[in-house]
Curated annotation (Swiss-Prot):
<dbReference type="GO" id="GO:0005634">
    <property type="term" value="C:nucleus"/>
</dbReference>
<keyword id="KW-0963">Cytoplasm</keyword>
<keyword id="KW-0539">Nucleus</keyword>
<dbReference type="GO" id="GO:0001708">
    <property type="term" value="P:cell fate specification"/>
</dbReference>
<feature type="compositionally biased region" description="Basic and acidic residues">
    <location>
        <begin position="679"/>
        <end position="703"/>
    </location>
</feature>
<keyword id="KW-0221">Differentiation</keyword>
<dbReference type="GO" id="GO:0040025">
    <property type="term" value="P:vulval development"/>
</dbReference>
<dbReference type="GO" id="GO:0005737">
    <property type="term" value="C:cytoplasm"/>
</dbReference>
<dbReference type="GO" id="GO:0050830">
    <property type="term" value="P:defense response to Gram-positive bacterium"/>
</dbReference>
<feature type="compositionally biased region" description="Acidic residues">
    <location>
        <begin position="600"/>
        <end position="613"/>
    </location>
</feature>
<feature type="region of interest" description="Disordered">
    <location>
        <begin position="600"/>
        <end position="706"/>
    </location>
</feature>
<feature type="compositionally biased region" description="Basic and acidic residues">
    <location>
        <begin position="652"/>
        <end position="662"/>
    </location>
</feature>
<keyword id="KW-0217">Developmental protein</keyword>
<comment type="function">
    <text>Participates in the inductive signaling pathway downstream of let-60 Ras and the RAF/MAP kinase cascade to regulate specification and differentiation of many cell types. Positively regulates the fate of vulval precursor cells. Required for induction of the P12 and excretory duct cell fates. In males, it is also required for proper formation of spicules. Does not function in the signaling pathway that promotes exit from pachytene.</text>
</comment>
<protein>
    <recommendedName>
        <fullName>Protein lin-25</fullName>
    </recommendedName>
</protein>
<feature type="compositionally biased region" description="Basic and acidic residues">
    <location>
        <begin position="614"/>
        <end position="627"/>
    </location>
</feature>
Length: 1142
């Protein structure tokens, strides 16, 4: 715009459109006020809104309105209230008003102090612009911090001139000093639930503290101090310091808080580590105990007492018969319990003290408490094991607690034992060991294993192999127990497996020497496998994970085929018919190759020979007098016809009988009527009926080749050759050439399966009468023929053990049992001349459990319903070596475990079998269902902690499956729609949440342990991974991948549910889970899990329901040094003050 004045052109600044619109708005508003028409938003027709001015800038309008409202010494109440109305109407924002206040340029201190009243009003409107973009959180601090600086500088400026303050107060006739309103605004700002934490969470918190201290000092320097203002400023400073302090979240779940002092989980770890995971070192066991102690908040003396309590319970149970489960019918954990009590237990306690969580005073208190409360248990154990068990453990712990603390305890126990008649002889047994007791054998075994520590491997191997020919198997088992407790069993197993392989193949040694070495190593390794059914055969022969280096060893192949164990579930994918046919062809080729390798050159497939076993021949030739009389009555002609039929068609008769056995229809009993020439059709009627029914049966489809057939094929011989070999054995002669140095011992073992089939046929009473006396004589001759290689008898027992169950198999097993027992006892009068007697005793001890299951009746578990009465009977179910427990046995095992203060290893064995067969879902669903239906807080809490301890039964499978099952059941997307679902019962959910949180904590701790323990982890780019087998060389890497995947999926699932924005029972479950994790005891597992769970989850909870989360909960998941976490925390605080829920 240009104005001409006497040939001069003056340029006047042109007003831009936003400014002009703002001035027009103010002018229109002023006119309305002057006309007594103050804007009222309840009447839209009279309202003057900024939105009616399209060119208007809200910030510029706000600046003008604030200046008009606070103009000089006059405060226009209409304009001030209009500003507040615009903020409530959201036509203006709180940050626009605050920026207008702090940017106001004025020399009048009074007017600036009056502006602080507007700051006080605006603090309640502070809110984030949008929750969707975390960067909007930065705009809050960019306004709040300058506002704080504006207030403190104004206070300091006012306090700097006390005379000026007095002048202002007189001039404006105010009751309060000029700093009153700035101080009130500062108080409101610091005490606000959003602004106060904002000023404390950034780096500016130190600057805020410094400014407040300066204000406090300025107040203290006033000549006329204002006590009320000084006190208010002190409260402001104290509040800010509280905001800066890290808050600790405390969570006490309803219903279970009263029972936190009772924790059976530590006691449950003892039988697990003693009997099922005894290969772990004492330090690893102590680390696991420590993490359980941290999670469960168990005191130090309780830990020591619980460990002693469980260990002595284990010793006592191994000495007694259980109801329906006597010692002879169950797996023997005797040496595992002995090794743990006397060797592992003191070491675990020492490691716990070295970790710093358990003190020497705690150990002393725990020992004293055990002496007071467990006296009867120690008495029972001492009498059974012939040793002063408490005194022995006390001696081991004396360097830890000191002699001053140990001597009174030792004196009390020793005096008590001397005054008790049954314990008098054992009072000094801790110092003077009784010979041939378990503790004596254990200490001798420790000394022998020390040779391995000093590198004297061959000396130890020779001493260990001599125990196979020793008089007592207990020494062997003691050494074996020490080896596995020291983590050296795999090393020893690999060494002997290599010796077995070298002895198998021709070498410079003579055949007799090779057979002797092979026999001893085979027996030694077999006993290890039998005594530790959970030990992987591949790990034993290989010395650790990785590709099997001696896969061609006949011991490895035979054991993979014929060591009876719980089968692992087949996880292979379904194959097409072409793939199956290719696999069958490959399996045949593998058999041909292995036959050629061991020196068997003949056709594998051949028709079965129609030659009757010798036992049957002898029976037919000899017969009985009764049969002869019957034959005479029938007539010579009829007898000749029957004999002719027997001679002409033995094969047809045999095939007919086999068809009758395998027919799906029940076989009819043979007709007992005599055949006469007048009625010949009646004799042939059953055979004709069978021949008519048999062709209707569909031929069975060829089965898929097993893993053993494809990966460790065994050589085999023909039936004809097996019959010839068996005939030699029955005559008491070995069937192999004793002077053939080029013989491969694998060819000897290849004959056993075919010979086993022939022996079972000979004992088939359904086809012919078995002469037990002749059968036992033949078996005795077989044992005599195997004197130079007794391990073949063990192989024969193993084959019979794995054969299909039948009466013939049972009868054969009884024959073998009687012959073996006769062999062991027959030489008792001439032991000096029988050099092989100790080895046969070793064999009897090794095969005793197999023979027992084959010959004796399996203990019948009573078929009763699970009622309170039946549970009170304390029935411990029994499982055979390859049995997969059903739900009934698992249920009774659960009742049995719940009634104890720990968990029996015989009950845990059922879980071990279920885990090996991947039947995790069965027992997990069953046991959690029992917990949820309990209804009693104390019982439910103990049961949850008991299941938590059971997670250590398996490597990681149980942890992963338990977590997945609970997530799928309680945190599924479908469950959100079931508001009245019974699974969300409040008390039951408290127990379930406790288990969920503990499972996640132990998972995170295990993951960290896998990553950091051992050599540096090599990262593999797994897209998916199956559960690794023990022999898998990438087992560690796959477990890390699976655990990470499990935890990440859980976090993603929580996000997915919460982002639906619906308040439901599932969200309530997530709230309780997040609170339970945040409120758990401070430990490494919690710190790791907290880092994995992003604070965004807590924000989502507050967004759905602001009342379900507080600031302390958010702080528990936030890292103060992480800016993203700080932004999330600001959004969380903004969500808490939302006026309504979207």
């Amino acid at each position: 715009m240009h104005i001409a004045v006497d040939n001069l052109t003056i340029s006047v600044p042109k007003i831009d459109k936003p400014t002009k619109a703002a001035l027009d708005y103010v002018e229109l508003l002023r006119e309305s006020f002057s006309a007594k028409k103050r804007q009222k938003f309840s009447k839209a027709s009279l309202a003057i809104r900024p939105s009616d001015f399209p060119d208007l800038s809200n910030q510029q309008l706000c600046d003008i309105l604030v200046r008009v409202a606070y103009n000089g010494s006059h405060i226009d109440e209409d304009f001030r209230k209009h500003v507040l109305d615009l903020v409530e109407d959201q036509s203006l924002t709180w940050n626009q008003v605050l920026l207008s206040v702090i940017r106001t340029q004025s020399d009048q201190l009074y007017m600036k102090s009056q502006l602080c009243e507007l700051i006080t009003e605006m603090i309640r409107f502070v809110q984030i612009k949008s929750f969707h973009d975390p960067k909007h959180a930065d705009s809050l601090i960019s306004v709040i911090l300058p506002t704080f600086v504006f207030l403190t500088k104004l206070i300091l400026e006012l306090l700097s001139d006390e005379d000026e303050m007095e002048t202002i107060q007189i001039e404006y006739e105010t009751k309060f000093p000029p700093y009153h309103k700035p101080l009130q605004a500062l108080n409101t700002l610091i005490h606000d639930n959003l602004c106060g934490p904002l000023l404390a969470m950034y780096r500016s918190s130190e600057e805020v503290t410094r400014q407040l201290v300066l204000c406090s000092e300025a107040f203290s320097k006033l000549e006329r101090p204002d006590e009320s203002s000084v006190g208010l400023l002190d409260l402001i400073l104290e509040k800010h310091q509280d905001n800066c302090k890290p808050t600790k979240y405390e969570y006490t779940p309803d219903g279970l808080a009263a029972y936190d002092l009772k924790n059976p989980s530590v006691r449950i770890l003892v039988p697990i580590f003693a009997c099922f995971r005894c290969h772990e070192t004492s330090k690893q066991m102590a680390e696991t105990v420590q993490i359980f102690v941290d999670i469960m908040r168990v005191s130090g003396d309780d830990v020591v007492f619980d460990l002693l309590h469980a260990a002595i319970l284990l010793k006592c149970e191994e000495s007694n018969n259980l109801l329906h489960l006597s010692k002879q019918h169950r797996l023997d954990f005797r040496w595992q319990s002995t090794t743990f009590f006397y060797k592992k237990l003191p070491q675990i306690i020492e490691h716990l003290v070295s970790f710093g969580k358990v003190t020497a005073e705690d150990v002393q208190k725990g020992m004293e408490r055990a002496l007071n409360d467990l006296t009867m248990l120690f008495d029972v154990a001492d009498i059974s094991w012939q040793n002063a068990s408490f005194l022995t453990v006390l001696n081991a712990l004396e360097p830890l607690i000191g002699s001053e603390a140990a001597n009174p305890l030792r004196h009390r126990r020793r005096e008590y034992m001397r005054k008790t008649a049954s314990l008098t002889a054992l009072a000094d047994s801790d110092e003077k060991l009784i010979e041939n007791t378990d503790i004596d054998r254990l200490l001798n075994a420790v000394k022998q294993v020390m040779n391995l520590q000093f590198g004297q491997n061959e000396e130890f191997y020779q001493e260990f192999i001599r125990k196979v020919n020793g008089d007592d198997c207990e020494d062997f088992d003691a050494v074996m127990s020490i080896l596995i407790s020291e983590g050296r069993l795999l090393e020893v197993g690999k060494a002997f497996a290599m010796k077995s392989k070298l002895a198998q193949y021709p070498s410079e040694l003579s055949l007799d020497e090779r057979i002797k070495k092979f026999d001893e190593t085979f027996l030694l390794l077999t006993r290890i496998i039998v005594k530790f059914p959970g030990l992987s055969i591949g790990l034993l022969v290989n010395g650790g994970p990785g590709e099997i280096s001696i896969a061609d060893s006949i011991f490895y192949r035979w054991s993979m085929w014929y060591v009876k164990r719980v089968p692992r579930k087949d996880k292979s994918e379904e194959k097409s018919e072409e793939e199956l046919e290719a696999m069958r062809i490959q399996a045949k080729v593998l058999i041909e190759e292995i036959n050629k390798e061991v020196g068997i050159e003949e056709e594998i497939e051949e028709e079965e020979e129609d030659i009757e076993p010798e036992v049957v021949k002898e029976m037919k030739e000899s017969g009985t007098e009764k049969e002869k009389e019957e034959e005479e009555e029938d007539g010579n002609k009829e007898t000749k016809n029957e004999t002719a039929n027997d001679e002409e068609m033995p094969g047809d008769e045999q095939k007919t009988e086999e068809k009758m056995d395998t027919s799906e229809t029940p076989a009819e009993p043979p007709i007992q009527q005599q055949s006469t020439p007048e009625d010949p059709p009646k004799v042939e009627e059953p055979a004709e009926r069978i021949n008519q029914e048999k062709p209707e049966e569909k031929p069975k489809e060829p089965l898929e080749p097993t893993w053993n057939e494809m990966n460790c094929a065994l050589p085999r011989i023909s039936r004809k050759k097996a019959r010839r070999y068996l005939g030699l054995l029955k005559q008491g002669n070995p069937f192999w050439s004793t002077d053939n140095n080029s013989l491969n011992i694998g060819a000897i073992l290849a004959a056993l399966p075919s010979m086993g089939k022939l022996l079972i046929e000979e004992h088939n009473e359904e086809k012919h009468r078995v002469d037990r006396k002749s059968a036992e004589e033949h078996m005795a001759n077989i044992i005599h023929a195997l004197e130079s290689m007794p391990c073949l008898f063990v192989c024969l027992v193993q084959w019979v053990d794995c054969a299909p169950a039948s009466p013939a198999r049972t009868l054969l097993a009884k024959t073998m049992k009687n012959a073996l027992e006769k062999r062991v006892s027959s030489s008792s009068a001439s032991i000096a001349d029988d050099t092989n007697l100790p080895k046969w005793r070793f064999i009897l001890s090794t095969c005793n459990e197999m023979i027992h299951e084959l010959t004796d009746r399996v203990p019948v578990f009573p078929d009763i319903t699970c009622t309170a009465f039946s549970a009170a009977r304390r029935l411990c179910p029994f499982v055979t070596r390859d049995e997969i427990p059903d739900s009934t046995k698992l249920k009774h095992a659960w009742y049995y475990m719940c009634q104890q203060s720990w968990t029996s290893p015989h009950a845990l064995r059922l879980l071990e079998h279920a885990n090996i067969h991947s039947e995790y879902n069965t027992w997990i669903h069953l046991y959690i269902t029992k917990i949820v239906g309990g209804g009693c807080g104390e019982i439910m809490k103990d049961q949850v902690d008991m299941i938590f301890g059971m997670l250590m039964m398996d490597d990681l499978n149980v942890i992963i499956r338990m977590h997945e099952i609970m997530m799928d059941f309680w945190l599924s997307e479908e469950a959100g729609n079931l508001q009245l679902d019974g699974r969300f019962d409040p008390l039951s959910m408290t127990a379930v949440i406790r288990l969920m949180a503990n499972v996640m904590l132990i998972s995170e701790w295990t993951l960290d342990r896998l990553i950091n323990d051992g050599p540096p982890l090599v990262e593999f780019d797994f897209t998916s991974a199956m559960t690794p087998e023990p022999e898998d060389p990438l087992r560690r890497e796959k477990w890390v991948f699976l655990l990470r995947q499990m935890l990440d999926r859980t976090v993603n699932r929580l996000f997915k549910i919460l982002r639906q924005g619906v308040l439901c029972t599932v969200v309530n479950t997530i709230v309780r889970l997040i609170k339970a994790i945040a409120g758990s005891a401070d430990c490494k597992a919690k710190r790791l899990l907290i880092k994995r769970i992003p604070p965004e989850i807590v924000f989502q909870l507050a967004y759905i329901e602001p009342q379900c989360a507080d600031y302390a909960l958010m702080n528990a998941y936030c890292d103060p040094k992480n800016e993203e976490h700080t932004r999330t925390k600001i959004r969380f605080l903004c969500a808490l003050r939302r006026s309504h829920i979207l």
